[in-house]
C-alpha cells in the first residue's frame, strides 16, 4: 500500500511538473535578432498595419496625439475589464527599457520581460506570425515616439481570471501559429494573409469565440458577438462581403463603402490605420479576403 501511495504521489508530481513546463511563459532568444538592424521608416508601416495606436493611444486621442502611446483605454469583456498599458518609450512607465527580444517575447509569445503571461486581450496569438525583421523595425519606430509618464493601472478581473498562471493552459489550448488560409496563393495573397491573419489581427474580432475565449477557426472571419460586449461584428467572408477587391481596398483607404456609406465605430479607427498603409498593402488585404472560404 505504501509503495502504491508513493508511486501515485510520484506520478502526480511528475504530471504537475510536466504541466508547469508545458505552460511556462516562453521568451524569445536574443540570438534571433543577431545581425538585424531595425529601421524606423519601415517600422512605421508595421505600426499602422498592427493597429498599435487603436488600443495604446489615450482614449479619444486624435491626430498626432495618437502617437503618444500612454495607454489607459478600458476593454470591457465577459472576463472583466482590461486596462491597456503604456507602451511609449518612457523608460520607467513605458517600454523604453525593453530590448528587441523583449518586444518579440510580448508580441509572439505573450510574455513580459519579467517572464509572466500577458492576457490575450493583447492579440499575441495573431502577432505570433510577425517576422523578426518586422519586430526590429517596429521597435526602432516606437523608440522615436513621444514618451509618456502615465503609470499603468491594474486590470479589474474576478477570480479565477485574475490568476495569470492559468494563461499558460489557455495558450496551450490556443496552439501555436499556423495559417488559416493555405494552398497555392499568389504573392499578393500571401502578403494579404500576413497582414490579415498576423499583423492586422482581423480574426481577433471577426471570428467567433467559445466560452474560453478561443477563436473558432472553423468559422474564420464569419463574424459573431463583439469580444468587448457591444453588438456584433460582421461576417467578412465572401458569403456576406460581396464587394470587389477594388471596393475593399478603397474602403480601407477612404472609409467609404460602394454604397457611399462610411465606416463607423471600431472600423473607423481601423481605417485610420489602414489609410496610412501603401496601396499595395490594401490591395493585398483585399486579394486575401477574396480567397477566404465563404461561410454563411
UniProtKB/Swiss-Prot annotation:
It holds the Pfam family Cytochrom_C. InterPro entries: Cyt_c-like_dom (IPR009056), Cyt_c-like_dom_sf (IPR036909), Cytochrome_c-type_DH (IPR051459). One of its GO terms (cellular component) is plasma membrane. It is a peripheral membrane protein. Heme c 2 binds at residues 202, 205-206. Binds 2 heme c groups covalently per subunit. Keywords: Cell membrane, Electron transport, Heme, Iron, Membrane, Metal-binding, Transport. Heme c 1 binds at residues 52, 55-56. SUPFAM superfamilies: Cytochrome c. It is found in: Cell membrane. It comes from the Bacteria. GO terms for molecular function: electron transfer activity; heme binding; metal ion binding. Particularly expressed when cells generate energy via aerobic respiration. This is Diheme cytochrome c-type. It comes from Cereibacter sphaeroides (strain ATCC 17023 / DSM 158 / JCM 6121 / CCUG 31486 / LMG 2827 / NBRC 12203 / NCIMB 8253 / ATH 2.4.1.) (Rhodobacter sphaeroides).
Amino acid at each position: 500500500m505504501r509503495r502504491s501511495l508513493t508511486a501515485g504521489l510520484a506520478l502526480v508530481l511528475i504530471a504537475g511538473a510536466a504541466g508547469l513546463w508545458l505552460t511556462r511563459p516562453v521568451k524569445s532568444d536574443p540570438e534571433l535578432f543577431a545581425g538585424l538592424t531595425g529601421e524606423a521608416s519601415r517600422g512605421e508601416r508595421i505600426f499602422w498595419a498592427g493597429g498599435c495606436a487603436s488600443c495604446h493611444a489615450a482614449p479619444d486621442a486624435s491626430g498626432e496625439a495618437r502617437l503618444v502611446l500612454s495607454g489607459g483605454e478600458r476593454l470591457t469583456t465577459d472576463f472583466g475589464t482590461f486596462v491597456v498599458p503604456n507602451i511609449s518609450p518612457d523608460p520607467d512607465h513605458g517600454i523604453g527599457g525593453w530590448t528587441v527580444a523583449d518586444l518579440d517575447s510580448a508580441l509572439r509569445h505573450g510574455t513580459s520581460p519579467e517572464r509572466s503571461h500577458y492576457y490575450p486581450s493583447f492579440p499575441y496569438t495573431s502577432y505570433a506570425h510577425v517576422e523578426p525583421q518586422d519586430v526590429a523595425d517596429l521597435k526602432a519606430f516606437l523608440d522615436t515616439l513621444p514618451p509618456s509618464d502615465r503609470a499603468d493601472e491594474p486590470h479589474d478581473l474576478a477570480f479565477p481570471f485574475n490568476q495569470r498562471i492559468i494563461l499558460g493552459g489557455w495558450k496551450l489550448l490556443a496552439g501555436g501559429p499556423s495559417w488559416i488560409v493555405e494552398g497555392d496563393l499568389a504573392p499578393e495573397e500571401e502578403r494579404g494573409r500576413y497582414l490579415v491573419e498576423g499583423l492586422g489581427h482581423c480574426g481577433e474580432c471577426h471570428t467567433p469565440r467559445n466560452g474560453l475565449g478561443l477563436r473558432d477557426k472553423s468559422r474564420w472571419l464569419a463574424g459573431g458577438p463583439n469580444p468587448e460586449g457591444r453588438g456584433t461584428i460582421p461576417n467578412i467572408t465572401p458569403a456576406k462581403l460581396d464587394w470587389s477587391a477594388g471596393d475593399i481596398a478603397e474602403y480601407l483607404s477612404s472609409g467609404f463603402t460602394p454604397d457611399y456609406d462610411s465606416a463607423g465605430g471600431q472600423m473607423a479607427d481601423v481605417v485610420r490605420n489602414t489609410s496610412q498603409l501603401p496601396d499595395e498593402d490594401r490591395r493585398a488585404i483585399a486579394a486575401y479576403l477574396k480567397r477566404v472560404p465563404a461561410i454563411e
